[in-house]
Curated annotation (Swiss-Prot):
Keyword Ribonucleoprotein: yes
Region (Disordered), start-end ranges: 37-58
Sequence similarity: Belongs to the eukaryotic ribosomal protein eL20 family.
Bias (Basic and acidic residues): 48-58
GO MF term set: large ribosomal subunit rRNA binding; structural constituent of ribosome
Keyword annotations of the record: Ribonucleoprotein, Ribosomal protein, RNA-binding, rRNA-binding
Entry protein name: Large ribosomal subunit protein eL20
A single cellular component GO annotation: ribosome
Gene name per UniProt: rpl18a
InterPro entries in UniProt: Ribosomal_eL20, Ribosomal_eL20_dom
Subunit structure: Part of the 50S ribosomal subunit. Binds 23S rRNA.
Pfam families: Ribosomal_L18A
Gene Ontology BP annotations: translation
Amino acid sequence: MSTYTVTGQFQSRDGFQPFTKDVEAENEDLARERIYTTVGSQHNRKRPQIEIKEVSAA
């Protein structure tokens, strides 16, 4: 498992809220999926409301 740094933003009441998170995943696609599930569940947002800008290996 590698660690990936994911940056992006999600829609909130006041516009978009930026975020940067470190996740462990086997590849970049799984890191994106992990972000969609964690940010979506923590902030009650659907996938179209989450915009991932960059995924890079940490």
